[in-house]
């Protein structure tokens, strides 16, 4: 049975690809799930599906509602949530996803650079692990699934 990991958060770098590559290299039985990572589609889905909205608020609100269907379902089905916080943008959605995971009792791993430690101290305190690199996430998955530490290369 595959282990399902929801990759939440920052969409402007290749961290998801790095995790997927590491999982393939180690032949781990892991299914990766993500939110819509095409920013334009994520922002426009509400208006594109439900029609033009009268204000920017409702444009964003209808898109957020539709995206939440995917996000909530994916989080509820996941064995682990990995939330990446990047330095360039404030990822309020990522913090919200982390909170949903914790509230649902789903294991949480955060992934961010050291300079965000203070800003994310409460989120990190709720996480089972705080990673600095996608490779550390893959190492956690390898250990959790095998129950063994792999020798360092």
Predicted region positions:
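Conserved catalytic or regulatory cores that recognize and/or transform ribose-phosphate-containing ligands
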Residues: 1-153
């Amino acid at each position: 049975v595959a282990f399902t990991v929801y990759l939440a958060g920052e969409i402007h770098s290749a961290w998801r690809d790095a995790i997927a590559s590491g999982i393939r290299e180690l032949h781990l039985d892991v299914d990766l799930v993500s939110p819509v990572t095409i920013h334009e589609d994520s922002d426009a889905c509400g208006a594109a599906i439900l029609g033009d909205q009268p204000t920017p608020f409702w444009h964003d609100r209808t898109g957020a509602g539709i995206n939440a269907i995917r996000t909530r379902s994916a989080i509820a089905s996941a064995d682990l949530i990995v939330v990446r916080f990047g330095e360039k943008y404030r990822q309020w959605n990522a913090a919200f996803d982390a909170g949903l995971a914790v509230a649902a009792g789903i294991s949480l791993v955060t992934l961010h650079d050291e300079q965000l430690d203070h800003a994310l101290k409460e989120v990190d305190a709720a996480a089972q692990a705080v990673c600095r690199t996608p490779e550390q996430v893959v190492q956690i998955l390898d250990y959790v699934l095998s129950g063994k530490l792999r020798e360092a290369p």
